[in-house]
Amino acid sequence: AKILDTRIISQLPNRYHGWPTLTRCKNGQLLVVCSGGRDQHVCPFGRVDFQRSNDNGNSWTYPRTILDGPIDDRDTGVLETMKGSLLVTTFTSLAYVPSLPKDNRKKGWLAAHNRIPEAQRKAELGQWMIRSTDGGITWSKRYPTIVNSPHGPTQLSDGRLLYAGKKLWSEGKDIGVCESHDDGKSWQWLSAIPTREGDRHQDYHELHAIEAGNGRLIVHIRNHNKKNNYETLQSESDDGGKSWSKPHSIGVWGLPSFLTRLRNDSLLMSYGHRRKPFGNQVRLSKDHGLTWSAPLSISDDGSSGDLGYPSTVELADNSLLTVWYEKLSGNRFAVLRQTRWTIS
């Protein structure tokens, strides 16, 4: 990849930013959401922060908090639907609780934790969506989605929205896809994605879906099973998402993957590379996801594995813009980084 420009786009230096998603609207405006306001990777402070750019990422608005529940709001996705609505996704977590200090060193953590009584905390766990029909000025109350994944749902050409993900808070932790027929207002379970022999489906995480140019649906899955550990696995559907192939390796070490369909119908996968060289990579498919190219490096100057979750959009001039989060060397607060690049 030919890198044109790399910069930090977050604007709160004393806050940790995590797990963003970038999307491009039909009018050319760019939107980024992230889990903002944080103290660290796991903490009680997470909220959904929203920024926009009207100049292809050269400048970004100051972040606006569009959702902040009483516990930790984590990975955030954003999408503009075919009808022009904006959908933002997140999930809530109490994973910070074991780290609550017993010795008052982090009084703020305890104060945040105690914003609601113990009895109500478990009821706050969920996977959530908020929706805007006025371009992000006003937002709905949050409402539950059946599954969650970091980057949220995808728009299909038949008008449906497809959300590939995991039932985070149900007993079975099922992996599969949901669909919406009403522009994201309500969601129905469509189908499970089968488990490969020898795998536990509980070790599949962080899915993302795209519709290829030939109508095939592709889902990428973060894999923590022993076989192909820390690789991105792939599953396909040729019947609109009613049935799926068993997940299989595509030879890509790195995770999680975000899928983009380019104007020329190539598919692009963007993923974090959490071993040396620490950074973010992309690969191209020119055959609707059958095969993937060798990796192209988008960034390789990371200092640790606390980085990634890249998402990529194609700009009007066919250059590409990728946004991810990264904890830079010497700074305990992760930032949002952006690079503009071309396929050289």
In which residue ranges do the predicted regions lie?
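Asp-box/BNR beta-propeller blade signature and adjacent active/binding-site loops
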Residues: 1-344
